[in-house]
Regions:
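Enriched for short, Lys/Arg-rich terminal
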Residues: 1-6, 17-27, 59-64, 68-90
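A short, surface-exposed loop/turn module that caps and links secondary-structure elements
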Residues: 34-58
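Nucleotide phosphate-binding site architecture
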Residues: 13, 48, 88
Length: 90
C-alpha cells in the first residue's frame, strides 16, 4: 500500500504547537492518528454537503481532525482540528 505525503495548513500548525505545550498526551495521539491516515486515508469518513471534499476522524469523543486527499499528488492535507461543535458549526 502506498504512503501518502503529509501537508499541514498553517492554522493547524499553530494549533498543534499550542497543543504540544498544553496537552502533550493529546498532541501525541493526534500525531499518531495523522500517521495512520497517511497509510490509508480512504478508511476514514468522507463528509457531505458544504464539506463534501473533506474527510474526518474523531481524535476523542469531542475533537475532530479534518483533512482532504489529493490523489494526483498523493498528498493528505490536514486542515483543522477542533471541538466537534466548532468544526460543524453547531
Amino acid at each position: 500500500m502506498k504512503m501518502y505525503k503529509p501537508g499541514i495548513e498553517s492554522n493547524l500548525k499553530n494549533k498543534l504547537k499550542k497543543l504540544f505545550k498544553k496537552d502533550r498526551k493529546r498532541y501525541e495521539i493526534v500525531m499518531k492518528k495523522m500517521e495512520e491516515i497517511l497509510q490509508n486515508p480512504h478508511h476514514y469518513k468522507p463528509l457531505s454537503h458544504d464539506m463534501k471534499h473533506l474527510c474526518r476522524v474523531h481524535i476523542d469523543s469531542s475533537f475532530v481532525l479534518i483533512f482532504s486527499i489529493n490523489e494526483n499528488d498523493e498528498i493528505v492535507l490536514f486542515i483543522d482540528i477542533d471541538h466537534h461543535d466548532k468544526i460543524y458549526g453547531a
